[in-house]
Amino acid sequence: MTSINTANINFKWDPKSLEIRTLAVERLLEPLVTQVTTLVNSSNKGPSNKKKGRSKKAHVLAASVDEATQNFLEKGEKIAKESQFLKEELTAAVEDVRKQGESMKMASGEFAEDPCSSVKRGNMVRAARALLSAVTHLLVLADMADVYQLLLQLKLVEENLMKVRNAGTEQDLGIQYKALKPEVDKLNMMAAKRQQELKDVHHKDQMAAARGVLQRNVPMLYTASRACLQHPDVAAYKANRDLIYKQLQHAVSGISNAAQATSSEDSSFSQTAGGGELAYALNNFDKQIIVDPLSFSEERFRPSLEERLESIISGAALMADSSCTRDDRRERIVAECNSVRQALQDLLSEYMGNAGRKEKSDALNTAIDRMTKKTRDLRRQLRKAVMDHVSDSFLETNVPLLVLIEAAKNGNEKEVKEYAQVFREHANKLIEVANLACSISNNEEGVKLVRMAASQLETLCPQVINAALALAAKPNSKVAQDNMDLFKDQWEKQVRVLTDAVDDITSIDDFLCVSENHILEDVNKCVIALQEKDVDGLDRTAGAIRGRAARVVHVVTSEMDNYMPGVYTEKVLEATKLLTETVMPRFTEQVEAAVEALSANNGQPVDENEFIDASRLVYDGVRDIRKAVLMIRTPEELDDSDFETEDFDSRSRTSVQTEDDQLIAGQSARAIMAQLPQEQKAKIAEQVASFQEEKSKLDAEVSKWDDSGNDIIVLAKQMCMIMMEMTDFTRGKGPLKNTSDVISAAKKIAEAGSRMDKLGRAIADQCPDSACKQDLLAYLQRIALFCHQLNICSKVKAEVQNLGGELVVSGLDSAMSLIQAAKNLMNSVVSTVKASYVASTKYQKSQDMQSLNMPAISWKMKAPEKKPLVKREKLDDGQTNKVKRSSQKKHINPVQALSEFKAMDSI
């Protein structure tokens, strides 16, 4: 303990502690724990009546434990000898391990000689515990020695930071800063190594944040101190230097706490884990509404659920009442809150009606589904409200800063103070919106990053203002300008970090939807400003449109970096390029012309139609980008309330292919197949007709059998139905819309084929007739082959080309291959059903399915459809005078009905 006290280090670690704080200690300790545990469990516990004797296994295990202990002793002695810190404690710990190792060796040897003795087992268990404690203590002390070395380096950096801050001359400042830099680099390397070894994720994050602050603020301390020395009469420089130094002190404290795995008092380094509060409340509420009717109690559940919901609604109301929330969005949030309230009351009423029942009624399940849907709708409106804020606040984020710097360069301190207030409000708004985005996000890691970035931005804000005030005091000073540039760069970098972090926890779909609406609002404002000859309003709103368009391009381009290059990314990037290189320059040109014409007092006319067209193109360009991004979304992922599906009816202008789940120019792959030329459609129809013949054969075969006890018939029907859907796809019809749907259908067929193969082989294995057995196995092999073929052919591709201004769609080869593969598979299924029945008839009558360990397959003839001998006409109310179709009046001949029982030829 003397080494700790004399070093003047803030050491918060008790040397007697056995708490393991790093992965390295765990890794070193794990083999010994395993060996000791294996030895202790090598025979049954408690007294035994078995004959006493030697246990070879116990002797071997005891020897391995002793060997591991000796290994720890060698390493421990080396560490104690080489370590400059905790030498006495390490030496004592090594001796303790040696002592406990000898005790363990003796106890394990006695136990190995008499493994049935409970007394000797107990002695060995106690010795094992003591040995593990001693080894753990040694490893923890070695870990503490490493931390102690890091803390010494930290202390050295802290002292050097103080020397830089207190330097009396520029020459002294340069010397001290030059000495500081290598020490900071060394500390950073040691801290990074420690960060990797820490067990606790929170402490890892704490270390990373503190290291970042240290690296970022050291150069700023030098610049601020230099400015202080050159202009000691400017109070803002001194204030800035002190703020930076305080940040560095917090960083040093954060590294110290993280290295010792203790909590930090600084909120910027100790972010709370978990997602947003509102998101958590909604998730928890969705779980709480599902209750077992047997255990439902109105007195217990109603107050709890109502209280939780009102808490959620209070949070939603705060968001709705925020200044950036649009009026229509506010109304939607209020409406959704009322709907959620009503849905909860309906749900509670259903629970009361189902109380005491074992099973939930259909009405209760419907009420639960409706409740879940309403909370989902509320969640969506809250997300859109947050995106309103993000879209407005994270727009031209550098403008308040540039205005502030411009005022400072002019030396106008009064203006600087006014713009400083605007800048501070802007910074607070960014932080507020970032926290709002966190509140409805489930992305825990993302929320942590946003809150950390927001905290650092909050710290940087007063430093930027001080730098501007200092520049205003000495506008001609090179040092003052350099100081301002440094803080400007840091601010812009930190805002980018916060912006990217917010983008990561918000949905690009929501962002594009909201941005599209906002641009439409701004376009309308622009046109009104033009008509009212409001030059300032026109210029300001046009600037907002340019900023929104640039933000859309940035967000979408960043999102495309997450995808592999392909048709989808090409279409999206093509839309962004069109907006950036063609649409926006034209819009800017029209705005400049309009502003120039309105500013001139000579009554120069403005081409209003040209301006409106250019503005409309901006909106259309953003909308096209959004449509391109949504190409790969499924119908379930699309927000029906904000997206009109008819807008997807546009035609492709370029040559693309349907791959995976992609939509081409908003069209499904099925729709494109429907556009094939008539000659190709005729060929496909011919193939489909041939396929229908095979389908008829399968229908005739499976219709004979009752499928209630025959899985082979059930599987055959399923495969037939899926294959029909796949062939319908080639004609531009049916439920399958995209290539991914066809691929999914092929996988289902393959799964059904695999199950049929399993059933068929079980029948074949028990079939005594070798010829029947070989036939069945051959047909099963064909099913596997054709399932594989169908899987390959399912990746149907339709190509859309623009040749000489004429749209040409081609995809005949892939469609024909798909139909042919389905036809072959259908034929094999028919043959397999027949062969399975034939093989089943070969079993000896004395053997049943259970005795043969067979699956339950019962070959029973299907009863004919029940039909009345005399058709009775029902006279519905109000329908007495309705003329019946002649087919409904037709009487069924009883003999004909009985004849529908078709007997198969005996085999």
Curated annotation (Swiss-Prot):
Protein species of origin: Danio rerio (Zebrafish)
The keyword Cell membrane appears for this protein: yes
InterPro entries: Alpha-catenin/vinculin-like_sf (IPR036723), Alpha_catenin (IPR001033), Vinculin/catenin (IPR006077), Vinculin_CS (IPR000633)
Protein name, entry field: Catenin alpha-1
Gene that encodes the chain: ctnna1
SUPFAM superfamilies recorded: alpha-catenin/vinculin-like
Source superkingdom: Eukaryota
Function: Associates with the cytoplasmic domain of a variety of cadherins, forming catenin and cadherin complexes which are further linked to the actin filament network and is thereby involved in cell-cell adhesion. Required for embryonic development, via maintenance of adherens junctions that facilitate the maintenance of the epithelial barrier.
GO cellular component: actin cytoskeleton; adherens junction; catenin complex; cell cortex; cell-cell junction; microvillus; nucleus
